[in-house]
Amino acid sequence: MLKSLCFVIRPAIVSRPQFRLPTIARLSLRQFQNQPQSVGFFTMAPLETRALALSPSATICPPSRIGTTELDRSAFDLDVQILSAVVEPGMIGKLRSHPSLKDLVLDLPKTKPIVECPAGLAPVAARDVKGLKLLRFHLSKESELPEEAKEVLKGAKALVKEVVRLGYDNWNASEILGACLPTTKSEDIPSSFTTTGHIGHMNLREEWLPFRYLIGQVVLDKNPGLRTIVNKLDTIHAQFRYFDMEVIAGDNDYIATVNESGCSFTFNFSNVYWNSRLHHEHERLISLFPPGCVIADVMAGVGPFAIPAAKKGCYVLGNDLNPESVKWMRENRLRNKVEPTLRVSEIDGFEFIRIAPLEVWTRPFDPAPPPKVSNRQRDREAKEARRKREQAKAAGQPVTETAPMSIPSQEVAIKPHPPQPPKLISHFIMNLPDSAITFLPSYVSCYTPLLAERSFIDEYGGEEEAKRKVEMPMVHCYCFTKEIEIGKAEIDILQRASTNLSFNLTPQVENYNLHHVRSVAPNKDMYCLSFRLPREVAFRHNG
């Protein structure tokens, strides 16, 4: 019944950031040649002699369909003979989790490792036992069991063989693609994609392009949360840094909705920049911003920094040059109800940096409405207050009684903001790692226009006092480097930043920090350079 089949020797498909598909062991022909037993569909070397541990279902693979470019799901139907143990119900959990057996248990999608034992497979002596179960293994015969496993299975009623019908739904994406795609020099298959809402985004090498529709359909089939699979093309829009892409499976729908940092973002994925791998970095930076401060987001995109910061209670200037990004940032501002604390603009980043300090001073934000909470939150806070009073009373500490709280109709205001928002920027964000460093010259003299404002001079008691006392903003500049060692990366980044800022930036500058964000490619890392803007730069006189 069994046919001669290939062994899948491909790495797993990995979806980032949300989930990981099962891994298939990578075995080379040389490793097979060194096995003490012949390698067939089920035949395995004893565990103690195998150099490489196999995944639970590594000895079962789909039929080889190498070279096919169109997906035929019926081509993966297969009848497989497997070894199973007839076990009493009370023993099943103990045997399944036993160290000598757990790696032998059948592990295939939509195939149960434990099933009811058919009457025809139960031994005659045990047919009166109710509820017999079959514990299935990924082996075909008893001789393939390691000695330790045989010893443990002496507690089973019998070892039997059964035939299981497997099909397309029983194989994961790695196994299907491994059975279809030809071997390459690197012996790999398309290994990763990112998810953005309902869209799976792949970056296929040229050698896989003839198979792109098959690859896309398999990935779509095996990930029910996706509706669209796209492949990034080589064309990149230099000004706005987004890629052209092609739908290779599913709906031709680029309008994605993503939930991140407690906010909802909707945008057209085909003409704006969004990277789902950066959500932890977004959260890290936003955590540095106290509520009530002013943030200037120079390259805000659709708002991954600006929207959560505004929702947190910061006052945000969100700017981008891409009209589509600005359109969706405005839409997301409405969706997340942060209109009072997010001001959106569409100008060049160089100009935005130059005018932002004066903009905030001369046109400060209106005070934001106080944050509100529901009655449920109000009740939780009241219970917490009572608990603290009871603890104080038990400890013999004086207790101040408060008047009963009035019950509002729906919501109550808590912890109001300061009555007047700040008129100075606390943080600049420059999230365009490919070129943000080249925008640093715009900070030279960006505070000088404030010296012409009488209110600014009066606030600090004179021009020189203002230069000395005004609080300088933090600058967070994202960038790439080809240097992999962190020491060399720091030298490279600081040299380029110093040149563009016309100021010698060193690790000794105020509030300096260099944060490694992620590795983008084998010789390309992303960093966030943070420092407090030097007064000598901000107030420098041109000419």
Curated annotation (Swiss-Prot):
Organism: Cryptococcus neoformans var. neoformans serotype D (strain JEC21 / ATCC MYA-565)
Gene Ontology biological-process entries: mitochondrial tRNA methylation; tRNA N1-guanine methylation
Family per similarity comment: Belongs to the class I-like SAM-binding methyltransferase superfamily. TRM5/TYW2 family.
CC terms in the record's Gene Ontology section: cytoplasm; mitochondrial matrix; nucleus
Name of the protein in question: tRNA (guanine(37)-N(1))-methyltransferase
EC nos: 2.1.1.228
Main localization (coarse): mitochondrion
Subunit organization: Monomer.
